[in-house]
Amino acid sequence: MSHRQGDGADYVADEYETEELDDSDDSDGRDLYSSDSDIDDYMLRNLVYSTSKHDVYLMSHFSVIHWSSLTSTRTEVLNVSGHVAPREKHPGSLLEGFTHTQVSTLAVKDKLLVAGGFHGELICKHLDKPGVCFCSRTTCDDNAITNAIEIYNTASGVLHFIVSNNDSGVRDFDLENFQLSKHFRFPWPVNHTSVSPDGKLLIIVGDNPKGILVDSTSGTVVAPLRGHVDYSFASAWHPDGSTFATGNQDKTCRIWDIRNLSKSVTALKGNLGAIRSIQYTSDGRYMAMAEPADFIHVFDVKSGYEVEQEIDFFGEVSGVSFSPDTESLFIGVWDRTYGSLLEFGRRHNYSYLDTII
């Protein structure tokens, strides 16, 4: 594994140092990705979520696993290899549940986990309660892969989650009663949707070179996003709510400013493949973009994305996630030999005066 920085990288005081958790020894928690776990080429690699600098959730086989870096222990949270059925009754919930669900994406926030499947399945679970609370099939379409899920708080503080699906639909669910609140349809499969920090706008990207900015209430297109030349797989808002990023199969991540959408601010280039996942730190200082395999790029946003740390390893990327406090970066790696969960810690340089204070 190597970590390479671009010109001026010595200026970056806060880089990410790594601890590798792999299959190479028998100590607890080292086999987070064993050799028979499965990632298909068309999975969009959103299978790792951090809820604190010590807690991360990820897929291993047919299980959602919680890994604690504080205690070096792993705990199975949800197993979908057999039959899963909801314990609670909600309108629209499939009481018969699902059997042998292949999870394509997941999201975790505020003690709630939502997993999406290859056939439109949605499985919701409260992390502090046993069993599953809600099961639903979003679509019976033949092309029903659940591509991405994002859990967010509305302006009124209500918890919702939004689902991007290969049937060209974007669906918004209220998590208080697990009811569908909005359903927007588009002319192409939707690979990813991101909700703006104020909840008013959506970035919609999919099997079209042109992404769109959409009003979150009406689904009306606010502006097209022109610049990519292939299909897009990822998107993310900067916490400032004015800038955002889109990742594409053309091997670039484009940065946009809503105050001038006639062209992107810049295009950041990958090395070998599509940009499959994008994450900003909660303070907006850094942005990570993931390629399908071998490379994660961490950019210093404050430098205008000029300063980059390149993380180089062996294996396919199953997901990337910053912890909410920005102190940790987790990378899921699938490989028959080197499968692992990588944890990076943010490096801080403090002056003598800072130490006294």
Whereabouts are the PLM-identified features?
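Short, acidic, Ser/Thr-enriched surface-loop or helix-capping motifs
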Residues: 175, 196, 216, 238, ...
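Beta-rich, blade/repeat-based domains predominating
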Residues: 192-193, 230-239, 273-282, 317-324
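Glycine-centered loop/turn positions within well-structured domains
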Residues: 168, 179, 200-201, 209, ...
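Loop/turn-rich, solvent-exposed surfaces of beta-rich toroidal or solenoidal domains
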Residues: 273-298
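Long, intrinsically disordered, low-complexity acidic/Ser/Thr/Pro-rich regions
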Residues: 1-39, 43, 55
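Aromatic-anchored, glycine/proline-accented short structural segments
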Residues: 204-207, 211-268
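WD40 beta-propeller repeat fold
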Residues: 36-208, 212-214, 224-226, 269, ...
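C-terminal amphipathic alpha-helical segment
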Residues: 56, 249, 259, 279-280, ...
